[in-house]
Amino acid sequence: MHLTPREFDKLVIHMLSDVALKRKNKGLKLNHPEAVAVLSAYVLDGAREGKTVEEVMDGARSVLKADDVMDGVPDLLPLIQVEAVFSDGSRLVSLHNPIT
């Protein structure tokens, strides 16, 4: 199987997101890279499912809460930007303060 660099990056994001969600389900708090992976995977999946940029941005606010992550992680993530391919083309999705 041959993957482009972009496809490889998406695969790594989804793998890390899966590991992070398993840890979250065990009651463990997520660290910075895990939180970024979960939010990024949410954006990529939302685009793939046919959601609009606005729907993805609104839904991302409910993915992780401050109780789900280690202390200080919400402060480290004032902005996450993910490029995703939507039905109308590639868009840069900006998540401002995604962890509430």
Curated annotation (Swiss-Prot):
CDD domains: Urease_gamma
Catalysed reactions listed for this entry: urea + 2 H2O + H(+) = hydrogencarbonate + 2 NH4(+)
InterPro entries, sorted: Urease_gamma (IPR012010), Urease_gamma/gamma-beta_su (IPR002026), Urease_gamma_sf (IPR036463), Urease_subunit (IPR050069)
Gene Ontology terms for molecular function: nickel cation binding; urease activity
Pfam families named in the record: Urease_gamma
Subcellular localization: Cytoplasm
GO BP, sorted A to Z: urea catabolic process
Gene3D superfamilies: Urease, gamma-like subunit
SUPFAM superfamilies found in the cross-reference section: Urease, gamma-subunit
Enzyme class: hydrolase
Pathway: Nitrogen metabolism; urea degradation; CO(2) and NH(3) from urea (urease route): step 1/1
Keyword line: Cytoplasm, Hydrolase
Assembly mode: Heterotrimer of UreA (gamma), UreB (beta) and UreC (alpha) subunits. Three heterotrimers associate to form the active enzyme.
Family: Belongs to the urease gamma subunit family.
PANTHER family the record matches: UREASE (PTHR33569:SF1)
Protein name: Urease subunit gamma 2
Species for this entry: Brucella abortus (strain 2308)
Gene name of this polypeptide: ureA2
